[in-house]
Amino acid sequence: MVNGIVDYLEKLNIKVFGPNKIASQLEGSKIFTKKLCQEYNIPTANFGIFENRIDAKKFLENTKYPNVIKADNLAAGKGVYICNNEQESFMAVEEIFDGKFGKAKNVLIEEFLKGEEMSYFIISDGSTIK
């Protein structure tokens, strides 16, 4: 879906149920979602975005632990590290930039939040809420 299959099928007037290319970025790009939360003041963990391992490691030298390091791409439920120290964090950054989970152009480093994770999926016609 992140490649736009829903958009393509809709252009062919084929009925399809799913998010369009832009909406699917909420699932496909962790960084897209973090920036969206930031833009609309949706509470989220503090974070940094890094395009290379050097800048990521510099940031990690002054961060608190544990932290969370994520590859910014679809990684089949993988590509997320909870790191307890600098050594684990450096290893996570290396593995992500070395392509362990596909070609990630960026790495997301965020504070670790303790608690239960919750996800919601909501289906709407765009105006009706029941």
Question: Where do the protein language model's features map onto the residues?
Answer:
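Short, well-ordered alpha-helical microsegments
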Residues: V2-V6, A56, E117-M118
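A short, GP-enriched loop/loop-strand-helix hinge that lies immediately N-terminal to
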Residues: M1-G28, N41-E51
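Short amphipathic alpha-helix with an adjacent loop that forms part of the alpha/beta core around
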Residues: K57-N62
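Short acidic-glycine loop/turn motifs at beta-strand connectors
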Residues: S124-T128
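Residue-level recognition of oxygen-bearing side chains
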Residues: F32, D55, E88
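Structural element of the ATP-grasp superfamily
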Residues: L36-Q38
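Helix-loop-beta segment of a Rossmann-like dinucleotide-binding subdomain
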Residues: L74-K78
